[in-house]
C-alpha cells in the first residue's frame, strides 16, 4: 500500500532465555501474539488511530553475536480501516507510530499475564523471584522512525534475512516459516483479528 510504514521491535528480557530454550514454540508464539495484541490495542485507541491496522512480523531468536536474543521485528502501516471500511491515517507526529514508553508497559503486562496463565496451567515453571524480577524490568520496545517511502519496506524485510540461505523476501509470498544459515526466522502476516 502507498502509505507510511513504521518499524517496531519487541524484545524479551534475557531472564526468559532458559524458558525460551525449554519451550521455544510456546514462548515465540506468545511473543508474536503479545506484540500483535500491543499494536492492536494502541491502534484501536481513538487518540492514536481508532482503526484496525495490520502487521508483518519476523522472529529473530539470535542477536548479532549469535547469543540467544528473542525479538520480533514488526512492520506496521501508518493507518488502518475504520468500522465503516474507510482508510484512516495515523495521528502520529511523524516520528513514531505509538508512544514507546506506553508500549513497553502494555507489552510487558500482556506477556506477563499470558506467562502467568501458562504457569498456572503447569505448562511452564515460573518461579516467584523470576516473576518479580520481570515486573521490575523495563522491557524493550524499539520504535524506528517511519520508512521514507513504501518501497523501503521491501529493503527492510530483506535485511531481516541477512546471511540466510533463503532470502527473507520469501515472506512476501506468505511463506509460513523458513530456516536457513545459523538463525531461525518465522514470519506471519496478520490483518485485523488474524490468528497466528
What are these regions (language model features)?
Residues 1-196:
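Beta->alpha loop/short-helix hinge microenvironment recognizer with preference
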